[in-house]
Amino acid sequence: MSNFIKYGIIGAGTMGQEHIKNVNLLDNAKVTSICDPNEGSLNQSSSLITNDFNSYRDIDELINNDDADAYIIATP
């Protein structure tokens, strides 16, 4: 069992990026995956994550890979 909570972010736009920043503030958490169909949003969000992570453009692929313990849904 890991010592941190692994978060997946669904929606990498402005709200998703704010959630990434907030997870980064937590000692026992990190973002391990992000998902957004927009490549530009994925690229912007990727710059905020300092650890290893996976990025997806398809939500089914994200869920099937089971990269996270919890998901934050930040979509409109």
Short names for language-model regions:
Residues 53-76:
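Beta-loop-alpha module in the N-terminal Rossmann-like domain of NAD(P)-dependent dehydrogenases
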Residues 1-50:
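N-terminal Rossmann-like dinucleotide-binding module
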